[in-house]
């Protein structure tokens, strides 16, 4: 039998196959491969002595580290302008991860009843990213996102409290995902999604819901000099630098620095580039 892993909890895998869900508690001969099955994987499994065993996992087209999922087309990055306030460094890390894995990132600014900062909106639109404003009070705004991801597998990501579960409640009318109020004491959203789970919206469309988190490591990059390849707006200018190895920091005749001075590159994005660069560099030292 063949199916898609839709949930994994403590070594138990739930596989959806032909409208049935099978609970797989053992890995069988697949255990020898030392490859951990992930939500989104296509698994081949068999029944043996009343249990279902995974025999193999089909080749993945991609794999994310956090959230840890496989075979996705879109990374839906959900943020909100306030409560919790938008974390642009985290957003830029998500974008780097998406670019690295050749996954289309879609930025969703939820709770649009709170006025979005046009600077932030235009900053990402102008470099070619899709940005949607959504609100649970505006069904049409969420419907536009659904139309954009139809026929594909998308993963919801972002900090706690930005409204991912509210979006899921709309997108998947037959499922109920618990939503909690913002914790005013900590001024952080309470995490209500406890595990990664894939939901089928229709026969061709799936959404993977994930727990919220407030940090993201760029462990998939081995060297800090790799980072520049995944900053989208750099691509237009990088071949105009004097040195091919230019890191766009202190090198002479750097086209990126020139474009920064001319305000063709966002100072906010560039500052986040420097922070990510130093973070990767510091980790490599140790």
For each feature predicted by the language model, list its residue ranges.
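Beta-strand/loop nucleic-acid-binding surfaces
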Residues: 21-37
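Canonical P-loop GTPase G-domain recognition
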Residues: 111-162
């Amino acid at each position: 039998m063949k199916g898609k892993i839709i949930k994994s909890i403590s070594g138990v895998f739930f596989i959806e196959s032909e409208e049935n869900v099978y609970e797989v508690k053992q890995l069988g001969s697949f255990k020898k491969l030392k490859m951990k099955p992930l939500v989104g994987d296509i698994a081949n499994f068999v029944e043996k002595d009343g249990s279902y065993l995974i025999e193999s996992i089909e080749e993945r087209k991609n794999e994310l580290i956090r959230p840890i999922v496989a075979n996705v087309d879109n990374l839906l990055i959900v943020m909100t302008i306030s409560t919790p306030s938008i974390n642009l460094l985290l957003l830029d890390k998500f974008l780097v991860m998406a670019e690295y894995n050749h996954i289309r990132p879609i930025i969703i600014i939820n709770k649009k009843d709170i006025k979005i900062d046009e600077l932030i909106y235009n900053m990402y639109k102008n470099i070619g990213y899709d940005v949607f404003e959504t609100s649970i009070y505006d069904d049409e705004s969420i419907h536009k996102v659904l139309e954009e991801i139809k026929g594909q597998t998308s993963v919801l990501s972002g900090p706690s409290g930005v409204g991912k579960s509210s979006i899921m409640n709309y997108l998947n009318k037959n499922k109920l995902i618990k939503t909690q109020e913002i914790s005013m004491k900590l001024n952080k959203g309470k995490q209500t999604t406890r595990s990664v789970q894939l939901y089928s919206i229709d026969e061709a469309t799936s959404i993977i819901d994930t727990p919220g988190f407030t940090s993201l490591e760029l462990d998939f990059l081995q060297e800090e000099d790799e980072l520049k390849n995944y900053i989208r707006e750099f691509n237009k200018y990088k071949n105009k630098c004097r040195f091919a190895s230019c890191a766009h920091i202190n090198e002479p005749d750097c086209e990126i620095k020139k474009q920064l001075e001319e305000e063709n590159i966002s100072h906010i994005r560039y500052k986040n580039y420097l922070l990510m660069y130093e973070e990767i560099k510091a980790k490599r030292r140790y």
